[in-house]
Amino acid sequence: MTSVAGARWGLVFWEQAGRTYAGVTGPETRTGTAPVPEGATFTGIEFAVGASLRSVPTPALVDGGIRLPDTTRRTFRLGGARWETPGPDDAEALVDGLVRAGTVVRDLLVAEVLRGHRPAVSRRTVERRFRAATGLTRGVVRQIERARAAAELLTAGDPAADVVTKLGYFDEPHLARALRSYVGRTVRQLREGGGGAIALDLGQRLTS
């Protein structure tokens, strides 16, 4: 499966051959190939840009991740506590619990900047906070999020010229380069569904 660059970290749970596993996935700065174990079933949760784990610095997760120990079908260990292993319908309850316990925290300044607000701090401070919260620069976060949005619009049938205008690309070659770097697909492949399986799920659960 083609993996897609992403500015968000996440939790992933999977079952394979009767065993249950859990891990933390980090932000990804480029497209690549992700192995998919045969017969495995997955549940994934992506966290909003600016959210982070108190016990694991996000920069340490970039282009990687960690396997969580002591995982069973019923529970897993994270941040010094045990949590119920979620199914697809239990993700929101798990996230609420992680936030209440302080296991997951969020930098509100990063969230405000992403919404277009101009904080009363220096650009250097904003950049430092972005790196601490996401492991990435503000510019890289913006480029990755824009490329993913472009891929979603193209998959939905929007013309490339409209995507260029809507998302602020210079021209169609600029859009094409971004898609190759961050999504691993051409405009035509996205519109026609070509290129094989891709880790770009329009219905994937996303937390704020």
Model-inferred region functions:
Residues 1-123, 133-138, 152-155, 159-170, ...:
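Alpha-helical bundle regulatory/interaction domains
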Residues 130, 142, 179-180, 191:
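DNA major-groove recognition helix of helix-turn-helix
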Residues 146-149:
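Pre-recognition alpha-helix immediately N-terminal to the DNA-recognition helix
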Residues 169-171, 178-182:
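The feature captures the conserved acid-bearing segment of alpha/beta-hydrolase catalytic domains
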